[in-house]
Amino acid sequence: MKIIILTTSTDHHLFFVNELKKKFEEINVILEKKKNHFSFKTSHNYQKKRKKFEKYFFFKDKNIKFKDEKIFYDVNNKNCINYIKKIKPSVIISFGVGLIKSKFLNEFKKVKVVNLHGGNLNYYRGLDSHLWTIYHKDFNNLLTTLHTVKEKLDTGDIILTKRVYIHKNLPFEGIRAANTVSCVDIVAKYLKAIKKNKIIPIKKNKIFGRYYSAIPSVLID
């Protein structure tokens, strides 16, 4: 079973990739370089604390890097699509890249294309879903969701979900790390089911949550 992971060059994504590589062979990694830009301030000191926390949490401050990755500016570009075609994957997993466009999906109609979303699709679509969930004090919806990818962002059918548990010993900057551990768990479960030809019931997504952009830094204070 050939697997493609579409992601970006961050410590939490590196941890995700490395953990799955321990469990599954023939994983190919594509890193997207494209960045989001906003008309409002999104940078916050919390992000520096988060980076430091994740470096220790995942790697005990060791300098770990991606290996054998392929880098493209945009996963939707022709060169990236052609590269994936040559690999002939059974599954494409998106974690942290930008919008996957229709031209990409049309090229891989026979491939399972799935995405990891840090929230409940029925309430929170878009960016920074965990932060928006916490902002609204909606702690019951702190979820990690694995869903199919459709043209409209975060409207795919739900494959698996897992709660992201927060506790008194978990700092605010550790929430993304906790979510990443949940991401590893549900993707491993999904891939094992495919490998064993087991059927995972997919829940039709009939309620599309509100779309949120990146959370402004002023709301984190």
Question: What name fits each language-model region?
Answer:
Residues 1-221:
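One-carbon transfer enzymes
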